[in-house]
Amino acid sequence: MSTVNVQIGLHELLNGSNAQIQLSVPQLVEKVLMRDEGKLTSTGAVSASTGKYTGRSPKDKFIVKEASVADKIAWGAVNQPISEEHFNKLYTKVLEYLKEKEELFVFKGFAGADRNYRLPIQVINEYAWHNLFVHQLFIRPTEEELTTHESEFTIVSAPNFKADPAVDGTNSEAFIMVSFEKRIVLIGGTEYAGEMKKSIFSIMNFLLPEQDILSMHCSANVGEEGDVALFFGLSGTGKTTLSADPNRKLIGDDEHGWSDNGVFNIEGGCYAKCVNLSHEKEPQIFDAITFGSVLENVIINDQTRIADYNDTTLTENTRAAYPMHAIDNIVLPSVAGHPNTIIFLTADASGVLPPISKLSKEQAMYHFLSGYTSKLAGTERGVTSPQATFSTCFGSPFLPLDASRYAEMLGEKIEKHDAKVFLVNTGWTGGEYGVGKRMNLGYTRAMIQAALNGELAKTETAKHDIFGLEVPLHVPGVPDEVLMPEQTWADKAAYKAKAIELANEFKANFKKFDSVSEDIINLGGPIA
């Protein structure tokens, strides 16, 4: 199937009598309720459930193996190839399926808040609530922008269309396929709305580096003086909590680009976890869930329509989607200058990493590639004790290119803009999980504050004898003994043994990076 035929098929779909294009939020909310796709909550949000798929399906995600990208993609378990033939046949079937639907919903918008680098996109949805979701998550065009909008990538989403693995070359009924040549994302068999968000992120992770822009899985905020901070960290490290600072404005909570102009948000909204959400703990998120917001897999009281954020009957991965303007303390448009400070967050359950360390450029690249944290019991089926987990660049499921490409770009930008990088351990202190205790949140906030305001630039440090990290000896508001992890352990020999064990896990994980420079390994990793 040629690109021309793809465009003809899309044109027919978009011009069909069933296509509802660029409906407003109230119109979409009406459609969701009339079509019985979801319920209205007491705060005016729409609540919908996603059936058996309550999270992403990494084993069902494919990139079409096309001549123009075949030698650029890092093929493997994350970027699984599928043939053009399989894609073309499935694409044709999905389009025929959607043409028969009574209604389709179309959103046109952008990914990328920097107008120089934004990607015009369109999303064709079988579900009205999915269209409401993308309306809130991506960047909405002005009326003037809409008149000249020409989509460069299209998501075609048909959750009720089930693939046949024997015929379609998939691993299950669900599929998420990206064709870079045809500029199409094809999604079916899963109702989980996050697949649309993350598909566009994966695409930006391919397109932006081609323009010398580093794409990043991180949150970002800016201080009153215009100083920018990035927060990288896997689930459970405190990224959302620590980047929500009343004295700093949020640029974005999840996906960013770093160009020669500075940092920009890729999205126009937030997709926040809301398990155990409360106004006391996270008022920004709690207050953002108003009319037009989307709740995913959150249990709602049948009579009062009040959301119960503590109920994990459907999943622990309950989510809320809302536009950036639903939060008070933000920068709009979501662009800012070059980062002054970069924070890597890790929740080390072995209790051996320092609560804060200063990183050299090589150490920053090493820890960026490592993307370490601990997977805790309860976060994944089968995990009963904490396990070391490594997610390359803090976002391996979304990286189509070789990881070293992103790391090299990070190193170049750190050097060029003199960004200060810190590794912050929000995990355990005084012993490993089960013996020690979780790091005091007040101490972590004080350490991050000291990093942001430049106090750690002049403080005395000591080199950690196993990890080679520069550990500050004094941080305002934090007891000195907390800063050196060994001092918090009663059994010093047990500390050393556990630290060497983790250092060896870092080294074993790093063996997969065969294309990185020796400097990163020799100057960036553990020294014992």
UniProtKB/Swiss-Prot annotation:
Cofactor names: Mn(2+)
Pathway: Carbohydrate biosynthesis; gluconeogenesis
SUPFAM superfamilies in UniProt: PEP carboxykinase N-terminal domain, PEP carboxykinase-like
Domain of life, per lineage: Bacteria
GO MF annotation: an example: phosphoenolpyruvate carboxykinase (ATP) activity
Keyword Glycoprotein: no
Localization: Cytoplasm
Keyword Manganese (UniProt): yes
EC number: 4.1.1.49
Gene3D superfamilies with a match to the protein in the record: 3.90.228.20, Phosphoenolpyruvate Carboxykinase, domain 1, Phosphoenolpyruvate Carboxykinase, domain 2
Membrane-crossing segments per the record: none
PANTHER family: PHOSPHOENOLPYRUVATE CARBOXYKINASE (ATP) (PTHR30031:SF0), PHOSPHOENOLPYRUVATE CARBOXYKINASE ATP (PTHR30031)
Function: Involved in the gluconeogenesis. Catalyzes the conversion of oxaloacetate (OAA) to phosphoenolpyruvate (PEP) through direct phosphoryl transfer between the nucleoside triphosphate and OAA.
UniProt name for this protein: Phosphoenolpyruvate carboxykinase (ATP)
Taxonomic lineage of the native organism: Bacteria, Bacillati, Bacillota, Bacilli, Bacillales
